Amino acid sequence: MAQHAVYFPDAFLTQMREAMPSTLSFDEFISACQRPLRRSIRINTLKISVADFLALIAPYGWSLTPIPWCHEGFWIERDDEEALPLGSTAEHLSGLFYIQEASSMLPVAALFADDNHPQRVMDMAAAPGSKTTQIAARMGNRGAILANEFSASRVKVLHANISRCGIANTALTHFDGRVFGAALPEMFDAILLDAPCSGEGVVRKDPDALKNWSPESNLDIAATQRELLDSAFHALRPGGTLVYSTCTLNRQENEAVCLWLKETYADAVEFLPLGDLFPDADRALTPEGFLHVFPQIYDCEGFFVARLRKMSSLPAMPAPGYKVGAFPFTPLKGREALHVTQAANAVGLLWDENLHLWQRDKEVWLFPAEIESLIGKVRFSRLGIKLAESHNKGYRWQHEATIALACPTHAHAFELSAQEAEEWYRGRDIYPQTPPAADDVLVTFQHQPLGLAKRIGARIKNSYPRELVRDGKLFTGNS
């Protein structure tokens, strides 16, 4: 594989020589950093099983190599990447897989290790959504996930990925993660803190990642990480599991941050060893039981993962100084709720008791029941999924609800050809040879929902959201 020129500050190389265990070769580390990163994907099991996905893509000639720590994860090699980017394939557009670096699948694997089944989870630094969507798949879209992102510009991307993957059990917030320990004390069964870091492990993807690196910045970042971890630990219930991870390699931002928590809270912190997380995990195992993944070990990005359990309750942090404000939604119950449910079921939108109906003016939403106890304690950017807007003639069903809730075997489902599906993604109306009989149509391709539409005569009127419409070459090879 071709090498690329990576910028390494001398002080960084000195630090890595000190941090790297004697069992690893420093020359192999440098060589691995200069190799381009292997591409990898994670199959979205909310929409398709691993076996069915592999059967679906078998004719394409893709070469898939299993990732040891994620049953749904594969390294991928394709001959047609230049002709058709992976993100423009039909399977990606319909949310059947997520393009995700292999190392970044490790934290969620650790979070659910040892048959852990949390019902309320927080992803404290969630964008762009790879780990949130992985958590949702492991939870089977049940329970609830609070997905927080501090960067306002990245919240929109986070929501887009959650929506594409058909996820219904999330609430989005936009806060500095340091508020949650005070705002939501001991409210979560499990928390993932994939902390902001110096990014030393990503040089295979970005050869200039270390251009602004300095030992001093590592220490500044570690101070922020300690505050975030402290907040996360306070938000975790006693007995709950917390995973701390970074995509960096120095000990100050990794082992030292976790050891600081242990020194601060002593017996309240138990480190849970990760040596049995997957075969060969012991090659990256630290004496504390963490995984310190140098890129040459598994031929992936550099990464760090620690898992711990909260053994006892902690004194509360000072109350947050912000005001939440009035909650603008009211529960929808009784006859009204029944009417909405029956109307939704009639067009193929189905849900269970894990989701509850709420209303704001003419909008109807579905909130995960597990998140309702947090209402009034924190301000949400977006909660659950928007199901519909009511109007005089009924309901205007929303695209994100269709992707998350539609039953592709419903009587109104209408399977498109590849050419028709591509036209759909381009925002164009469909003119099938044999139009559907029903006026309300659940449009599908590869038996996956693409949207709800109206049949007008022989034409299916396109309802694909304008902001999602695609141009350029798509999966049939036509521009």
Swiss-Prot record:
UniProt-annotated catalytic positions: C247 (nucleophile)
Enzyme Commission code(s) on record: 2.1.1.178
Residues bound to S-adenosyl-L-methionine: A125, A126, A127, P128, G129, S130, K131, E149, D176, D194
GO molecular function, one term: rRNA (cytosine-C5-)-methyltransferase activity
Subcellular localization: Cytoplasm
Reaction equation(s) it catalyzes: cytidine(1407) in 16S rRNA + S-adenosyl-L-methionine = 5-methylcytidine(1407) in 16S rRNA + S-adenosyl-L-homocysteine + H(+)
Keywords, ordered alphabetically: Cytoplasm, Methyltransferase, RNA-binding, rRNA processing, S-adenosyl-L-methionine, Transferase
InterPro entries named in the record: Methyltr_RsmF_N, MeTrfase_RsmB-F_NOP2_cat, MeTrfase_RsmB-F_NOP2_dom, Nol1_Nop2_Fmu_2, Nop2p, RCMT, rRNA_ssu_MeTfrase_F, RsmB/NOL1/NOP2-like_CS
Signal peptide: none
PROSITE patterns: NOL1_NOP2_SUN, SAM_MT_RSMB_NOP
GO biological processes: rRNA base methylation
Group of enzyme by EC: transferase
One cellular-component annotation, GO: cytoplasm
Top-level taxon of origin: Bacteria
Pfam families: Methyltr_RsmB-F, Methyltr_RsmF_N, Methyltranf_PUA, YebU_pre-PUA_dom
Major localization listed first in the record, in broad terms: cytoplasm
Homology family: Belongs to the class I-like SAM-binding methyltransferase superfamily. RsmB/NOP family.
Biological role: Specifically methylates the cytosine at position 1407 (m5C1407) of 16S rRNA.
Record protein name field: Ribosomal RNA small subunit methyltransferase F
Species in which this protein is naturally found: Salmonella schwarzengrund (strain CVM19633)
